[in-house]
Amino acid sequence: MKNKTLIVITGPTGVGKTEATLRIAEHFNVPVINADSRQIFSEIPIGTAAPTAEQQLRVQHYFVGNHHLEDYYSASLYEQDVLNIINSQHTPISLLSGGSMMYIDAVCNGIDDIPTILPEIREKMMKRLEAEGLEQMCNLLRELDPEHWKIVDRNNPRRVIHALEICIQTGKTYTSFRSNTIKDRPFNIIKIGLNRDRDELYNRINQRVLDMIEEGMIEEALQVYPKRTLNSLNTVGYKELFEYLDGLTTLDEAIFKIQSNTRRYARKQLTWYKKDTAFQWFNPDNIEEILNYVHTMISNTSK
């Protein structure tokens, strides 16, 4: 019988994960293991809606502002770091919360053993991307690994370039490293999904973008503008503001695009989450209902 339980909380961006997670963490008196691939960067707390200093005083958080934009970090590294944290915790319950699909999947199911990319290979491929463009990089991937080319998100330069880096560094296809074998974990997993009525969620997203602008996101984007080609800034919010800072759009157009692209990302998140039938879905305002479910699940697994 497994003696530890990992509670996983996720949901689309803007749904209200942070406050719900804080209340659940306080109930169990455990820290929050953050699962957000952008909130790890210390330079962009506003645009990533990272937990505030006040929220982090309420509950200890891991993986918030602990890296710089230039740092290389991956789902594979995250998997190992989180497993080490869970193993070192003396409490029977650990709490993982966030919206990064790959991070959550890496912890729950494991990730394939992909080779670490050499810095010179990464630099070479990023220069090729900048010089030749994403379409040409997709064509190259089609030549080197046609199987992965069929399934990769070809609008996501990070995914395309990473697959190419593997192909070029190892001389093998990226597909050959993907076993998709689910790894056994030494803990039980309870999966909680948070969602709201679609109109309510979209209104929250639209308002949150306006709040971010009010809190200083434009100034934040201006500070990191010299680093805008970094993959860590290839994300909703900053891409649109960089276009504004380049004089390609007005501020109103940039804000509209951020809202629209964030809503699109929320839909993508929900599509991915719904594939996993282990998630039990709740409105994030119904904390007591969530806690009752968690306690019931823990009780059932301990029998």
Where are these regions (language model features)?
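Phosphate/pyrophosphate-binding catalytic cores of soluble transferases and nucleic-acid-acting enzymes
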Residues: 1-303
